[in-house]
Design a protein with these regions (language model features):
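PLP-dependent aminotransferase class I/II
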Residues: 301-378, 384-387
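Hydrophobic residues in beta-strands of the RecA-like P-loop NTPase core, especially within AAA+ ATPase
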Residues: 196, 276-277
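N-terminal basic, amphipathic alpha-helical segments
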Residues: 1-130, 139, 150, 330, ...
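Short hydrophobic/aromatic beta-strand micro-patches
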Residues: 320, 394-396
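Conserved core of the PLP fold type I
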Residues: 138-271, 282-301
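Short Gly/Ser/Thr- and Asp/Glu-enriched loop/turn motifs at secondary-structure junctions
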Residues: 82, 166-167, 386-392
Length: 415
């Protein structure tokens, strides 16, 4: 029995293990999952200190530690040195944003899906490609790392972002998420820690959860990682690297300053940490800033997918890989994919080589300007965050709305 009385002691969570069977740490994990689902434990709740909870439950501290560690691996908890342990802010959020078409009358705004106006150009090029005498080869296996011409196309694609590399440092992946998951799996081990922005892309969370990698929120100022925050995480959290989206960050839509890009590159070199830079939206910005990779190419894995800029179904991404990571990442991509689709890779490379990709990107940017003008006019008088050229805009809700009530009203209105 616990030495201390907790009858009138305020605790954010008082689980009941009296009916638990089997290992107590697993029972505690199960109770936490249930309490999160039923709303007893809400997102953002700070949990009691582990020693305090162990005393309350009359169990060994190691039981609580094992339970919290497993909950962290499941994506339920987030902990940092000196700040305690919290229920993850997005623990109840839907991780799969793409939906089917069961309700065609519902306007889908959950996932960031590019407009389809450029698809006719992709279709036209694909039709010409399939009429070539060697078109049957596009349905066979191909070079797992991409052909020389495809990797040269990757070099040309990166140059559009102001980043110069060599084809020997370019790998191909089956889209940005595939590239990101491969990079995490190849270069980090289960239990390793990766620094991210406090608000970050849901896809890195699902990949990290799959691989048992812990995401550590880095201190931000004006939506950008601070030097102090990165140094603290390296020293105290022992992070192995950081993940960043410098351009039209998902979900904040912030564009990282040139000063911060250079600071991250300098710290990566000084501390010998990995930087995974997601450049998926770089070419949609009006005046693209140089990627972090351009300042520290030997420390940065630079991912650039064609999904948001050319076509969502063109599952191709180019990956800049420094020498020190090349063999490991190439092997992981092979293990995951065997080979990327020769057809999609050939279409992607061809669109870049003949200038069609540039035409589609110009159309995308013009469409974004038109859409942003519409939303600015339609919601005049309301506070709209994010740049007026962004693929995402944020509406600051009036006081009479909560996020949940707005979501319900929007769904009733068909959104």
């Amino acid at each position: 029995m616990s030495i201390n009385s907790f009858d009138n002691y305020p605790m954010s969570w008082k689980p009941d293990l009296s009916r638990a069977s089997g290992p107590k740490y697993l029972a505690l994990v199960s109770l936490m999952e249930d309490d999160i689902k039923n709303g007893t434990l809400k997102a953002g709740t700070k949990l009691p200190p582990q020693r305090e909870l162990a005393d309350y439950l009359n169990v060994n501290l190691s039981t609580i530690s094992r339970a919290f560690k497993l909950c962290g691996q499941k994506g339920l908890l987030s902990a940092s040195v000196g700040n305690g342990t919290y229920v993850c802010a997005d623990v109840s959020a839907e991780t799969i944003l793409l939906c089917g078409r069961e309700n065609p009358r519902l306007i889908e705004m959950g996932a960031l899906v590019p407009q389809v106006s450029g698809n006719r150009l992709v279709k036209s090029y694909t039709e010409r490609l399939l009429k070539r005498p060697d078109a049957l080869n596009l349905f066979s296996y191909d070079d797992p790392e991409g052909t020389g011409l495809q990797r040269e196309a990757g070099v040309a694609w990166f140059q559009k972002s102001g980043f110069s590399t060599h084809k020997d440092h370019v790998l191909l992946a089956a889209g940005g998420q595939n590239a990101l998951t491969a990079a995490l799996g190849a270069l980090l081990e289960r239990g390793d820690k990766l620094g991210t922005d406090p608000l970050t892309y849901p896809g890195v969370k699902t990949a990290a959860k799959l691989l048992g990698i812990h995401l550590i929120p880095i201190q931000n100022h004006d939506y950008e990682m601070t030097e102090e925050g990165i140094r603290y995480a390296v020293q105290n959290e022992k992070i192995k690297g950081i993940y960043v989206i410098p351009d039209y960050h998902n979900p904040t839509s912030h564009i990282m300053s040139l000063k911060t890009r250079k600071m991250i590159a300098a710290l990566a070199r000084e501390k010998h940490i990995l930087v995974i830079e997601d450049g998926i939206n770089n070419l949609l910005t009006e005046n693209p800033l140089p990627p972090i990779a351009s300042f520290a190419p030997e420390q940065v894995i630079y991912l650039s997918s064609l999904s948001k800029t050319i076509a969502a179904g063109l599952r191709t991404a180019f990956v800049h890989v420094p020498d020190q990571y090349h063999r490991c990442l190439a092997t992981t991509l092979y293990s995951m994919n065997i080979s990327i689709s020769p057809l999609l890779a050939a279409v992607s490379a061809g669109l870049i080589a003949d200038g069609t990709a540039d035409e589609i990107i110009r159309g995308r940017k013009e469409e974004l300007r038109r859409r942003n003008h519409i939303i600015s006019q339609s919601l005049k008088g309301f506070a709209l965050d994010c740049p007026p050229t962004s693929p995402m805009r944020y509406l600051r809700l009036p006081d009479y709305f909560t996020g949940k009530s707005f979501e319900i009203c929007a769904k009733q209105a068909g959104v």
